[in-house]
């Protein structure tokens, strides 16, 4: 039965995905049946009845914006997602001058159980063990359908569906995923704990396929990688 780890930040180890400012799922098992709960599903599309999760693309590239409650910050990154080979590459983007902010590249190879953290400026490399199993970026088959609605306005809108890990009409969700009805592209994933949003990730500029598979190959400096994680902040 499909399972979710506790928090969605980077599809695997929570620490690993927090490092990359990515998405991960980390809040236990989903126990829905892929159907609208009582009272749900009456959005823009009206009463939709039973719904089945769509199948998200297996290989794509795009961009993401992640909000972390623990820091109160937003971070941006380029993302290469290869579900077929269970690997992800995250490249921090600089959108504004942030004093003493280090930018990193993250290469997560789940079949090998390792993550490489590479500082963009110096190519200094850390090699970190991934302790959590691969968790694909998709809608688990046992998710609960919440709603269908349109984003945007007249002539410029897209229809999306909202899914969650809510078990019944009387329980609260800890994960919400929004995916397009057409092609099942990820739009947003939100993770909550104790009724507060702790992680929220938006995906955009998605293109199917991996333009350059070599992005998953660590640089030569990783042959002598250190085992400790590097800090995102300057050391001085």
Curated annotation (Swiss-Prot):
Q: Quote the PTM field.
A: N-glycosylated; the glycan contains mannose-6-phosphate moieties.
Q: Name the family.
A: Belongs to the ependymin family.
Per UniProt, what is the name of the gene that codes for the protein in this document? EPDR1
Q: Which InterPro entries match?
A: Ependymin (IPR001299)
Complex formation: Homodimer.
Which BP terms does GO give this entry? cell-matrix adhesion; myofibroblast contraction
Report the main location listed first in the record.
other
Q: Which GO terms describe its molecular function?
A: calcium ion binding; ganglioside GM1 binding; identical protein binding; phospholipid binding
Q: Which cysteines are joined by disulfide bonds?
A: 54-184, 100-234, 125-222
Q: Which residues are glycosylated?
A: 142, 194
Q: Does the keyword Membrane apply?
A: no
Q: Where is the signal peptide?
A: 1-35
| Protein name, as recorded | Mammalian ependymin-related protein 1
